[in-house]
Swiss-Prot record:
Organism for this UniProt entry: Bordetella parapertussis (strain 12822 / ATCC BAA-587 / NCTC 13253)
The name this protein goes by in its record: Orotate phosphoribosyltransferase
Cofactor(s) needed for function: Mg(2+)
Binding site for 5-phospho-alpha-D-ribose 1-diphosphate: 29, 75-76, 105-106, 109, 111, 130-138
GO molecular function: magnesium ion binding; orotate phosphoribosyltransferase activity
Length: 224
């Protein structure tokens, strides 16, 4: 499930402008050589994170998913949940709703408030927010935390769906990591944009035409 076409297109342009999305030849975590690379860690200033949060908020509103709060898994999800909560508070479609958020620590504190959870109590329908889904480990841990607190995972919200099958080349999964998460936990995965939106840019903008064939070949081999 992706955001609206206009939101997705604007986000792809934004990611390119920020140097977060690049074309070339990159060895990614899976060991594959990818013709594009998306590094959300390069959203690292107040301006860029503020704009990113606006895209997350719009994608969540576009999705129509019913939710009560946000959860950001440590560590990357922490600033994403925080900033997106702020963006939602100012979103016209939210009608003044003040969306709470929480996140976890990797290690429990034994002083102060203690425990592994920080922020609002986990209650109601909770949206997990992260940058991408690679192996689904972060989502699994988040679902366990949310359910243990008596709350309900409502959706996973990510920046980019790579639409890519997992596994070695001689034993590729028929599903992507995003599809596996949706099937395993019975919840939608909402992305601001996807590889399909990147391909649309490559097809429509002559500036990036030189990368079109490589990305299409990669998608044909590994895509879903």
């Amino acid at each position: 499930m992706s955001a609206s076409a206009s939101t997705a297109a604007d986000f792809v342009r934004f990611a390119l402008d920020e140097g977060v999305l690049r074309f070339g030849s990159f060895k990614v975590k899976s060991g594959r050589i990818s013709p594009y690379f998306f590094n959300a860690g390069l959203f690292n200033s107040g301006r860029s994170v503020g704009a990113l949060a606006g895209f997350y908020a719009q994608a969540l509103v576009d999705s129509g998913v019913a939710f009560d709060m946000l959860f950001g898994p440590a560590y990357k999800g922490i600033p994403l949940a925080t900033a997106t909560s702020v963006a939602l508070a100012g979103h016209a479609a939210m009608a003044g709703r003040d969306v709470p958020f929480a996140f976890n620590r990797k290690e429990a504190k034994d002083h102060g408030e203690g425990g592994t959870l920080v922020g609002a109590p986990l209650t109601g329908k909770v949206v997990i927010i992260d940058d991408v889904i690679t192996a689904g480990t972060s989502v699994r841990e988040s679902v366990e935390i949310i359910r243990a607190a008596g709350a309900e995972p409502a959706a996973v919200l990510i920046a980019l769906d790579r639409m890519e099958r997992a596994g070695p080349d001689d034993a590729l999964s028929p599903h992507s990591a995003v599809q596996d998460v949706a099937r395993t936990y019975g919840i939608p995965v909402v992305s601001i944009a996807s590889l399909a939106d990147i391909m649309t840019l490559l097809q429509d903008d002559a500036q990036f035409a030189e990368h079109r064939a490589a990305v299409q070949a990669y998608r044909s081999k590994y895509g879903v």
